[in-house]
Amino acid sequence: MNIALVAHDQMKNTMVGFCIGYESILKKYGLYATGTTGKRIMDETELNINRLASGPLGGDQQIGSLIVTQEIDLVIFLRDPLTSQAHETDIQALIRLCDVYHVPIATNLASAEIFIKALDRGELSWREVRKSKSQRI
């Protein structure tokens, strides 16, 4: 199971705190992150992050590509709802891909905590079943 971690600039500290708090759970999974977010997490934790490009430089689109190829099973995208983003269309495309491919996406800390606790309890294992069935078709 692979998790994508993305955070807008004003939410990076929150993402780092989240990763520190749930490091024992997150370390069990493959982790992908946009460039700056991934660096910040790696600087503050022992987590191994597959870093992609920075969000505005195509990182969101790279995560979208991983969603299409069923390599991402959960997206935690801590968005800043109070600041306009220059790459808003990329963000909307990423959210749309999560909807199309049935990938759970958390866009705030509350939903991120719900998903990470569900993941720890094995409640997202349906993703693995779904992937194995689609590979047989």
Curated annotation (Swiss-Prot):
Which key words tag this protein in UniProt? Answer: Lyase
Which reaction equations make up its catalytic activity? dihydroxyacetone phosphate = methylglyoxal + phosphate
- Read off the SMART domains from this record: MGS (SM00851)
Q: Name one GO biological process term.
A: methylglyoxal biosynthetic process
The EC code for this enzyme is 4.2.3.3
Identify which residues the record assigns to the active site: 60
InterPro entries, per database record: Methylgl_synth, Methylglyoxal_synth_AS, MGS-like_dom, MGS-like_dom_sf
CDD domains the UniProt entry points to: MGS (cd01422)
Q: Name one Pfam family in it.
A: MGS
Listed binding positions for substrate are: 8, 12, 34-37, 54-55, 87
Q: Does the keyword Lyase apply?
A: yes
**Keyword Lyase recorded:** yes
This chain's function reads: Catalyzes the formation of methylglyoxal from dihydroxyacetone phosphate.
Task: List, alphabetically, the PANTHER family matched.
Answer: METHYLGLYOXAL SYNTHASE
Q: Which family does it belong to?
A: Belongs to the methylglyoxal synthase family.
- Please state what the protein is called: Methylglyoxal synthase
Q: Which organism is it from?
A: Clostridioides difficile (strain 630) (Peptoclostridium difficile)
Task: Give the gene that encodes this protein.
Answer: mgsA
